[in-house]
Amino acid sequence: MTSITHAELGWNEVGTPVSDQFDDVYFSNVNGLEETRYVFLKQNLIPERWQEFDRRRFVIGETGFGTGLNFLAVWQAFNDFRRANPDATLKELHFVSFEKFPLSKQDLIKAHQAWPELAELAEKLHRHYPPAVPECHRIVLDNGAVTLDLWLGDIKDCLPSVPYGEEGIIDTWFLDGFAPSKNPEMWNQDLFNGMAKLARSECRVATFTSAGFVRRGLIEAGFAMKKVKGFGTKREMIAGCMETRQQQSRHAPYFNRTSASHLDSIAIIGGGIASAALAKALVQRGQKVTLYCKHAQAAEGASGNRQGAVYPLLNGNHDGVSRVFAPAFLFARQFVEQAAQALTFDHDWCGVTQLMWDEKSTNKLDKMLSGNFAPELIQKLSVGETAAKIGLPIDMASVHYPLGGWLCPAELTQALFTQLGTLDNFTAKFEQSVEQLIWDERSQQWQVHTQGQHDTYSAVVIANGHEFQTFSQTADIPLGQVKGQVSHVPATETLSKLKSVLCYDGYMTPVNPNNQHLCIGASYDRRHLDTEFDVNAQQENAERLTQCVPNQAWAKEVDTSGNLSRQGIRCVSRDHLPFVGNVGDFSAIKRQYADLPHTQAEEIEVISQFPNLFCLLGLGSRGLSSAPLMAELLASQICNDPLPLPVDVLEELHPSRMWVRKLRKGKAITEL
């Protein structure tokens, strides 16, 4: 993986942070906040444009996050705008920024002490400031009114990874960073061209420098630029707007992602954590959402367990699943922490400890550790450190996820739906089994058919887990179904000492003090797709622990003989990644891509997909760690907002990816 290095800072005589890497200050020694307001807000005409803006979300791009001063300043200005203009069309601010050398959290907090007027906003940022993990970190603030996408890594690598459609995504660019003379590697034509590709047709740009090659480079990229008066004693700076934008998309035609068109109502089918997180993300965006759940209450399916572990799925190369689950886990923690401010549900960020219980698991975990991840994300523990961390004697080393923990998914899911139920733009229809989805070409609406009746919606999301085959549109998606049984174990004096989630060839949670039980599990049964109690699975759950931890008496105290348990059916994918996005028209795709290997790239048609039909499926056994970000991704796509993952990672989540992979190789799709 590409490791991220924190900024190395010094502090000058007036308390301004100075980069050791670039020998330059992060902001003006005199008044950095006023300079930000002058250079980036005033010269980009931000206040005037917000008054006239005709879309819900205004997107700002920034080339160097640094201390986050520009972000905090524009956030403050946006709050002032919202208070003064409650009826404005513009409701949301989205800030996309890049940083090669992020400040440590401690340095960030110290830098922000220079601006007491920003302290309240800065504290909200500190709460969710990410560890040094590559690529995009989405931070949702003020109940969705403000979103920060912080891309960690070299901008020359990150900028080509940002997904965008034909219209672009950026309304205004803040071209900021260390002075061109101090950081010549960043200031080049590739940067200016990349900014132009992401820009919308009315995009504006401003920068503190007046260097001639910067102005000429931006003009070459398609911006009309001019010199204007600089801030304070600076004579000049440059500002301008997009003049000639090329219509293009970064999505490959066979992995195309489209937003919902003519959006006025959305139906979500499903009642689990994925549906709850998606409904919340859409409602925050002002959408009218109706939920259909076949059960009498939410979380009756795979999201109904008492305790589930929350931790990332990583690998040493930081590819595939790792590039999805690292940011997804961090977003899930943010999501849960924000939910806990208003809702009551059992959870504990006690950490997760994964035992090196045999040679195979040791090799696998050592390989994962070779990825050089930030210590806030994962640490290796010795035998003694492991025993101290879990609170029980153990004779094996481990890896520890200090930010991990457990939560009660049933309580969280139900609490989210209860909260949503108080809002005017959310309706839940429980005990409503959707039987059929029919697209009405004349009205351009989906008919959602339940027992003997139907309602119409402009868009539909299928998020019903293992029951995805209910509908003809998703029946051919190559997903699997696996039964799992979790055993509920009464606490003993010794087992109550466990103070971290423990993973081996299974998992065990600490005792929940509210019910004096812990959970162990979970079985993996592909043959019996029911929710009946399985006495063999109950016994095997206990045996897996004693087989992996054979030398400790406490492992034998786990008593499953009371047959207390819960069964559910997971919806799983072969590559361990969810299916998120537009639902493909399988029959049409087979026809249009029948000769895909021999088709010239420029002649490849955009993949056939059902209009305004989306899915959020295949979350498997890691749904608690992935559901919030996958829901945020899909809500962003539906609403045509910037997407929170690199474009090649989005391809690995595309619902049609397995069909496309086979067709690109010239293989017939008979069975996946």
From Swiss-Prot:
Keyword Flavoprotein belongs to the record = yes
Q: Which reaction does it catalyse?
A: 5-aminomethyl-2-thiouridine(34) in tRNA + S-adenosyl-L-methionine = 5-methylaminomethyl-2-thiouridine(34) in tRNA + S-adenosyl-L-homocysteine + H(+)
List the EC numbers from the record: 2.1.1.61, 1.5.-.-
Pfam families, alphabetized: DAO, Methyltransf_30
- Name the UniProt key words of this record, in alphabetical order: Cytoplasm, FAD, Flavoprotein, Methyltransferase, Multifunctional enzyme, Oxidoreductase, S-adenosyl-L-methionine, Transferase, tRNA processing
In residue numbers, the region (FAD-dependent cmnm(5)s(2)U34 oxidoreductase) covers: 269-672
Q: Which GO terms describe its molecular function?
A: flavin adenine dinucleotide binding; oxidoreductase activity, acting on the CH-NH group of donors; tRNA (5-methylaminomethyl-2-thiouridylate)(34)-methyltransferase activity
Matching Gene3D superfamilies:
D-Amino Acid Oxidase, subunit A, domain 2, FAD/NAD(P)-binding domain, Vaccinia Virus protein VP39
The record's section on SUPFAM superfamilies has: FAD/NAD(P)-binding domain
Q: Where in the cell is it found?
A: Cytoplasm
State if Membrane is listed as a keyword: no
To which protein family does this belong?
In the N-terminal section; belongs to the methyltransferase superfamily. tRNA (mnm(5)s(2)U34)-methyltransferase family. In the C-terminal section; belongs to the DAO family.
**NCBIfam families per record:** MnmC_Cterm, PRK01747.1-2, PRK01747.1-5, tRNA_MNMC2
Under what name is this protein listed?
A: tRNA 5-methylaminomethyl-2-thiouridine biosynthesis bifunctional protein MnmC
Biological source species: Vibrio vulnificus (strain CMCP6)
